[in-house]
Design a protein with these regions (language model features):
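Mature catalytic domains of secreted/periplasmic carbohydrate-active enzymes
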Residues: 1-268
Length: 268
């Protein structure tokens, strides 16, 4: 997969280390046995990080905040948060330098105190330079929920300009988009977006200094379908062809009225 991502011209990759079903792709070090080392005898997260480092790609970790498998999530929320922080501590300590943590699921229990201060402080103590992202979901796109967060998210939605005048630090933004309708691998989901749509979304993201996070779901053996690899490689070819426009200059606020999908760049 690493070679495919290189051809796709990726700057970073986000791996789902644990999703809402509670299964971990990393060694949970005794927290539970519901993880990859206990089922297939492999630490998938370590393999992922090693591959990223080999190919010069920054590894980021998606990690669920909600957990359908862990009983304490429903019965003792404070105890669950201790379990969650121990899980994150394992990822912070055992896999070298991590580019970022991409959290998701707080929207499932919005009225609870998620003790974000404790979680983010833990991460900073082990990984001071890592980015911390917490997906605000479709209903709250572009909102910054905590001062320690480094990016806002636009899940399946067009990014908007961010007012940084009152911010003590630079806040990034990112649009995450699926290729078909599902986030994970779905064998019978053929509702693929066109390459034109994906390229247009990518261009719009860069207009607003936003990153484009393109999701494809690997099969059970870790491989990608031919159509997934093809889409990634075409996006990579297009981004390499337009590298200067996408990654070097800064976008301006000037709009081309008769060509709404075009934008003007300035150097320096």
């Amino acid at each position: 997969m690493g070679k495919v991502r290189v051809r796709a011209n990726c700057r970073y990759i986000v791996l789902t280390t644990r999703h809402h079903d509670g299964f971990s792709l990393y060694n949970t070090c005794g927290l539970n046995s519901y993880d990859a080392p206990h089922t297939c005898g492999r630490d998938i997260v370590k393999e992922f990080v090693d591959a990223c480092n080999k190919h010069g790609i920054i590894p980021l970790f998606y990690h669920t905040l909600l957990d359908w498998h862990e009983e304490s999530y429903k019965t003792d929320f404070k105890e669950y948060l201790k379990y969650l922080r121990k899980s994150i501590e394992i990822l912070c300590k055992n896999y070298g330098k991590i580019g970022g943590f991409w959290f998701d699921g707080m929207w499932d229990n919005p009225n609870e105190d998620w003790e974000e201060d404790a979680l983010y402080s833990l991460i900073r103590s082990y990984q001071p330079d890592t980015m911390i992202i917490n997906n605000t979901g479709i209903q709250h796109r572009g909102e910054l929920g905590h001062i320690e967060l480094d990016s806002v998210t636009f899940e399946r939605g067009r990014p908007q300009p961010i007012n940084l005048e009152c911010s003590p630090k630079y806040i990034a933004s990112e649009m995450c988009e699926t290729f078909a309708s599902h986030w994970g691998y779905a064998e019978n989901d053929f509702n693929f977006k066109s390459l034109g749509h994906l390229i247009n979304s990518f261009a719009i993201c860069r207009r607003y200094r936003s990153n484009f996070l393109f999701n494809v779901g690997p099969k059970a053996d870790g491989s990608l379908r031919t159509i997934d690899k093809g889409a990634l490689e075409i996006l990579g070819q297009w981004s390499k062809m337009n590298d200067e426009a996408l990654h070097i200059p800064e976008p301006t606020d000037i709009e081309i009225k008769d060509k709404p999908n075009n934008f003007i760049l300035r150097n320096g």
